[in-house]
């Protein structure tokens, strides 16, 4: 295993710049997830690390060795793709050992590595089978096993769970997380699914339009997003937003006024805020409370109620707010579409964003950070 460093890395196709000035440090043995919407450049960046795409400018290092001009086959990387890429006419043993056989490795070493990988992935009893007899989850484990057999310095996984159904995705992400702990290797995982990112990563890299929007631990990004994009992307359901007017400003708190004239203090860094500004207030659906518990409250008309048994999600239409406000609470809630509904906003759970998307630093200390 090795560390991976990107310094001012750019990737362009003609005049179209995809990856833009990416600076990133990935420690040896770290599990890092690249996450972002479609077209943000996450897979392109992974392919640049693998050597499948040339870097237009900037530097890529594995440890202290510059890798820009090193061929993919000499980089010591192993890739797992969304497509399993298994040979249908070969059994599992031959699929997993194919690369080693091409390299003319010793037969005893091949057998040792394949059996070891099969034991780790619980595939030992299936090695004589062909891929067509396996489930989607088993096929993906074979693809991962093939990478383990090659003993790479860096594992690169490009949306490996996208072809699986919801239940299998949950199972496989647990297995991949266990695999990382078992092998202790450097892993870089690409996904558009922020739930996968939050549950698997030691560190998340959020990409937006080719730029790195924020890097941090999952709970850091959840509780302390540095901009509105990260705030809206991380978390499901996504964060609620509403426009507010700045009434008063102090160094460690800001008084905001909502569209219905209610004013309250928010504990955020006020040194970059100006009285009279229009800003955006954010609050997560799960952080809304009953009207009586909040520092202020909002009232609207219920549009949709999603009753999931273990929780209820209420979509509330508010005047002067573009999108429905979402209120999320555990268990069940007796409310129906068309009802008038009031919820409370706890000031210490609020986020405040400038018009350009920059976040004001929250001063409330969340547990576990």
Swiss-Prot record:
The gene coding this protein: malK
Function as written in the Swiss-Prot or TrEMBL entry: Part of the ABC transporter complex MalEFGK involved in maltose/maltodextrin import. Responsible for energy coupling to the transport system.
Major localisation: membrane
Protein name, UniProt field: Maltose/maltodextrin import ATP-binding protein MalK
Pfam families: ABC_tran, TOBE_2
PROSITE patterns: ABC_TRANSPORTER_1, ABC_TRANSPORTER_2, MALK
Gene Ontology terms: cellular component: ATP-binding cassette (ABC) transporter complex, substrate-binding subunit-containing; maltose transport complex
Any one GO molecular function term: ATP binding
Subcellular location: Cell inner membrane
Membrane topology of this protein: Peripheral membrane protein
Entry similarity comment: Belongs to the ABC transporter superfamily. Maltooligosaccharide importer (TC 3.A.1.1.1) family.
Catalytic activity: D-maltose(out) + ATP + H2O = D-maltose(in) + ADP + phosphate + H(+)
Organism of provenance: Photobacterium profundum (strain SS9)
Catalytic activity, EC: 7.5.2.1
